[in-house]
Structure formats: structure tokens, C-alpha cells
A protein has these predicted regions:
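Extended, charged alpha-helical interaction scaffolds
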Residues: 147-179, 183-200, 204
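Residue-level signature of catalytic and energy-coupling elements of molecular machines
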Residues: 29, 85, 177, 229
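N-terminal cationic and glycine-rich segments that engage phosphates or anionic surfaces
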Residues: 3, 11-81, 88-89, 93-136, ...
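Short glycine/threonine-rich loop/turn motifs
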Residues: 187-191, 195-247
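Short hydrophobic alpha-helical runs that function as membrane-insertion/retention elements
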Residues: 83-84, 106-109, 178, 198-202, ...
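Post-transcriptional modification and biogenesis factors for structured RNAs
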Residues: 2-8, 190-194
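Conserved nucleotide-binding/hydrolysis micro-motifs of P-loop NTPases
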Residues: 31, 89-92, 112-118, 182-186, ...
Length: 283
């Protein structure tokens, strides 16, 4: 007799996923905020309580923010748009660069250069200069330069690679910025707001959530916390890309089968951010 496994109840499945995610977040220390004396009152709705002078973030709010951010980033990636990861804290820079690279997106992990978004043409010119140096230095023509000039060009290349290496694939303005600690990356946030670019951010209890479109309340100082959130967001981007690849393949097969124009995938609309509902402050 053929046994067909029953389809899981959506409500129970959602609760199961949330419980597993909550356990992972707690183990990573995502719920630990800053000292209560350093808090931003606007973060009150996202705070569960206080323990030993440290604010404890409500993990349910972290899950809610993370799921909303994942859904949005999946939509962005499915349209072929770019997502720029930004995190220059020493403890999280390596993880952010790794996860951004894993999902094929540009990143800034060393220092935010003023005008990266608002003066994008200049940034593109600097990237062109970086490519020029990378062609010149290994070439035979480089040997014709004096020792002093060679040293100067190598130094220029190292500096540009450190500052611009992560955004060399930024061929156009990104659709979204993923920021880790908007308080530290305030210049990036300000530029994104000026350019109308959506912001997703891991925000601690000392941050202003009103400056971010999709806040994820959580510890932005812990390495494990940053790694976990960055990995989850990168996974969502990869899912969106995979979705597009499947649709493109199906469209190509349809075109080969004689469907003509009907086999072409329909262009996807630009992802929209739903109006954020702020939880009521806890008594």
C-alpha cells in the first residue's frame, strides 16, 4: 500500500521554523543589547526587558524583522538587481565580505568612501583606474617605469584594492543596502536615503530604527550574531537568483518548443517595501 506523507500544517510548520530560528538566534547571542544607559528610546518596542544593566532584545521581533528582510531581498535578487552589503566593524568585516561574496553581491568591509552612492560616476572612474593598474602591473611595460614610480603605482593599487575591491562589481546603483550597525555606518545610510535606496539593517538598542526601512533588531557587536544574520540574508539572495535561473531555463525550453514570444519570461516589477508596522511598546 502506497503511503503518502501528509502535507505539513502551514501554521505548525511556521511555528516550527520560528522555534528553530529563535534557538539559533539565542545561541548566537543576538538578543543581547547594549547597556541600558546607552539605549535609544525609539528601540523600546523591540526590547524584551533588562538584565544586569543590559537590555535584552525581544527575539520574536528579531525573527519578524529577519523574515521580512529575507522576503524583500529574495524579491530584489529575483529581478537581477544589486544588493550592497556594508559593515566596517573589525569583528564582522570578514564574515560580511565572505557572505556577500558567496551570494555574488558587492560589499564594503573596510571603509565607506564618501560619495559611493551620491557621486557614483567618480567611484566608477576610480574602479576603471583600478582595472587599469591591474593590467599594467603584471605587464612587461611596467618594467620601463623607474623603481620609484613602480613603488608608487603598487602602493596606489594596494590602497585602491583595499577601499574598492569589494565594490568592483558595482556596475550600477544598488537597489538595496544591507547594513550592520547603522549608527557606525551613518554616512552610508544618509547617502542611501538621499538616493532613495532601500535599507535593511541589523540594529542594536542604541540605534534609531526610523532611519532604516527594514530593521532587524539584534546584537550588532557579536561576531556570531553578525555571521548568522549575514548568512541568512545571503541565503535569501541565492534563493531569489535560483528562482530567476529556473524561470529563464523554462522560458528558453518553451521558446525551443515553438512557443515563440509566449515563452519569454515576463519582466518583474521593482520590489516594493511594505509599510512597517512598529510593535506597541511593552509595559
Amino acid at each position: 500500500m502506497l503511503y503518502i506523507e501528509p502535507y505539513p500544517d502551514p501554521q505548525r510548520e511556521c511555528e516550527r521554523v520560528s522555534n528553530v530560528l529563535a534557538q539559533e538566534l539565542i545561541e548566537a547571542g543576538v538578543h543581547f543589547g547594549h547597556r541600558a544607559s546607552r539605549w535609544n528610546p525609539k528601540m523600546r518596542p523591540y526590547i524584551h526587558g533588562r538584565k544586569n544593566l543590559i537590555h535584552i532584545i525581544d527575539v520574536r521581533e528579531t525573527i519578524r524583522g529577519l523574515l521580512r528582510a529575507r522576503k524583500y531581498l529574495k524579491q530584489v535578487a529575483s529581478t537581477g538587481s544589486l544588493v550592497l552589503f556594508v559593515g566596517t566593524k573589525r569583528q564582522g568585516a570578514e564574515a560580511i565580505a565572505r557572505e556577500a561574496g558567496r551570494c555574488g553581491m558587492p560589499y564594503v568591509s573596510d571603509r565607506w568612501l564618501g560619495g559611493t552612492l551620491t557621486n557614483f560616476r567618480t567611484i566608477r572612474n576610480r574602479l576603471a583606474r583600478l582595472e587599469e593598474l591591474e593590467v599594467l602591473i603584471p605587464s612587461e611595460a611596467f618594467g620601463a617605469y623607474s623603481k620609484k614610480m613602480q613603488s608608487s603605482l603598487r602602493r596606489e593599487h594596494r590602497k585602491m584594492l583595499r577601499n574598492l575591491g569589494g565594490i568592483r562589481t558595482l556596475s550600477r546603483l544598488p537597489e538595496c543596502l544591507v547594513v550592520f550597525d547603522p549608527k557606525k555606518e551613518k554616512n552610508a545610510i544618509n547617502e542611501a536615503r538621499k538616493m532613495g535606496i532601500t535599507t535593511v539593517a541589523l540594529i542594536d538598542t542604541d540605534c534609531d530604527p526610523d532611519l532604516v526601512d527594514l530593521p532587524i533588531p539584534g546584537n550588532d557587536d557579536s561576531i556570531r550574531s553578525i555571521e548568522l544574520v549575514a548568512a541568512r540574508l545571503a541565503d535569501a539572495i541565492l534563493e531569489g537568483k535560483a528562482e530567476t535561473a529556473v524561470e529563464s531555463q523554462a522560458a528558453a525550453e518553451g521558446a525551443e518548443g515553438g512557443e515563440g514570444a509566449e515563452g519569454k519570461p515576463k519582466p518583474k516589477a521593482r520590489p516594493m517595501v511594505a509599510k512597517r508596522s512598529v510593535p506597541k511598546p511593552k509595559a
